[in-house]
């Protein structure tokens, strides 16, 4: 019985040691990327209020397949090569970027790229078009 307890204890110690050794997966740990430019995140409610306001640009950064399922009325499909030409001339114009949902990062990437060009009033709506449609808000299909 004591032999079994010793073997179990030794196995437990080896497992705990292995977990500690393998925690870094054999590579050096690197710090997470810190971005200097981050858009302000808005809720669906804020997005809806801005949409009703009317003088706000909405940019859909989804794939063509997701865009074809539906988009926010008046939103511009942004996932194109000539996206810079779609931007307003006024660098202070209010713009909302969205993609599919909170798991999609395309709208954050697009918003940061726009901010690099000097645009100052850039917003991102993390809930995206899926959140918009699931909450019963109006949408259009092409």
Where are the language model's segments positioned?
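Catalytic cysteine-centered active loop of the rhodanese-like fold, especially the PTP/DSP P-loop
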Residues: 83-132
């Amino acid at each position: 019985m004591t032999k079994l307890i010793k073997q179990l204890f030794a196995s437990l110690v080896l497992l705990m040691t292995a977990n500690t050794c393998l925690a870094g997966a054999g590579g050096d740990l690197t710090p997470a990327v810190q971005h200097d430019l981050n858009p302000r995140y808005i809720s669906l409610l804020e997005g809806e209020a801005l949409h009703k306001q009317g003088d706000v640009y909405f940019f859909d950064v989804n794939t063509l397949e997701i865009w074809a399922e539906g988009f926010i009325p008046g939103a511009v499909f942004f996932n194109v090569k000539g996206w810079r030409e779609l931007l307003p001339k006024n660098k202070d114009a209010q713009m909302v970027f969205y993609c599919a949902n909170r798991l999609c990062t395309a709208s954050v990437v697009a918003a940061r790229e726009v901010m690099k060009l000097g645009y100052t009033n850039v917003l991102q709506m993390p809930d995206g078009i899926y959140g918009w449609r699931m909450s019963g808000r109006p949408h259009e299909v092409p």
